[in-house]
Amino acid sequence: MDSKFFKSLSLAASVICLVTSCSKKLDEAYQNPNAAVRQPVENIFPSLVGSFSGSASSAGSSYGNGGDGLLVGRYIQYWNNYTLTNTDNGGTQYDQMGGTIGGSDNLGSLWGAFYYGQGQNLNKVIQWGSEEQKWDYVGGALAIRAWGWLELANEYGDAIVVKQAFNTNLSQFAYDPQSLAYDSCRAAAYKALTYLGMTGGAVSQGNFAVGDAYFYKGDVNKWKKFVYGILARSFASLTNKAAYSADSVIKYCNLA
């Protein structure tokens, strides 16, 4: 009887341990053995700037404007490339008589740069930068997010994920209208200007330049001009809409 009792008790304890151990998420239970879970925002920020044109990582490379710019140039017939056969030539053209079919990721580089290359990395700069009162980094990250929304809206039209963006609990996402991306662009831009104007906490041009060594070297005034340029472009993109505001275009062009 004692043996059965202790076996039952042991089984119950094992079940309890199993249930409680499963309460942790996978990334909490098994920490990254190769790097600290939390990295300095100064180390993350350079990759956000680099992904303007291109990036490289183990899970995907060449995300940014560079790759898509090459293909857009073919689409608007700025240039083309010619190989030995007509079949190969047709695969490099973007018009009624040619184009990319099948499983190609052509014209997906900007998408990858925004949602993957910047994505959660940019979110962490905003989160950790706020916790550390590095408002210049927060403002810079929001400026890059505004740039991304604008570029996505211009390139992909209504095929953009806005409301569900960066939701790690989803594996399928719903597209949103282009206008929502423009609205999100401006919202991020206005927030960026607010943070770039803050001087308290751990704000320091010297420290901001550590992560911003190759863009504006930590100069928040240049970052503000960058944001004003984004706002001007966002309003200029609506020239064929009833909501077009020429005054806003002129205002932000003068500030940029």
Spans of model-derived segments:
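Generic surface-pattern signal
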Residues: 11, 50-57, 127, 194-197
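Sec-dependent bacterial lipoprotein signal peptides
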Residues: 1-21
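Long, intrinsically disordered, low-complexity segments
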Residues: 2, 19-23, 219-220, 233
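Structured, solvent-exposed acidic/aromatic patches
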Residues: 38-42, 81-256
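Membrane-proximal, proline-rich intrinsically disordered regions
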Residues: 22-80
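Helix-centric, low-specificity signal for extended rod-like, repetitive segments
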Residues: 17-18, 67, 138, 226
